[in-house]
Amino acid sequence: MSFLSFLLGQKKSSASVAKERLQIILAHERGRGDSPDYLPQLQQELVAVISKYVKIDPEDIKVHLERQDTLEVLEVKIEMPQN
């Protein structure tokens, strides 16, 4: 089935595209070794994407990167409105 999907040009899900972008960003930052300057831009893009589906306040999304030795943890907290 995946070969047919490739030939027919079916779109990737937004989740898989976002995952790939985050992996690229993290790999790039690991190579540089300095502080992550992409976090504000990442937060803005997350607000834009989530706002397409749910009305949220930009302050409801928190992005934090924690580094310990060889481990990096990207933490994203999103407060969803009560419906």
From Swiss-Prot:
The molecule here is called Cell division topological specificity factor
Tell me the gene name: minE
> Which top-level group of life is the source organism from?
Bacteria
Species whose genome carries this gene: Bordetella pertussis (strain Tohama I / ATCC BAA-589 / NCTC 13251)
Similarity remark: Belongs to the MinE family.
Keywords, sorted A to Z: Cell cycle, Cell division
Explain the purpose of this protein.
Prevents the cell division inhibition by proteins MinC and MinD at internal division sites while permitting inhibition at polar sites. This ensures cell division at the proper site by restricting the formation of a division septum at the midpoint of the long axis of the cell.
Gene Ontology terms: biological process: cell division; regulation of division septum assembly
Mention any Pfam family matching this sequence. Answer: MinE
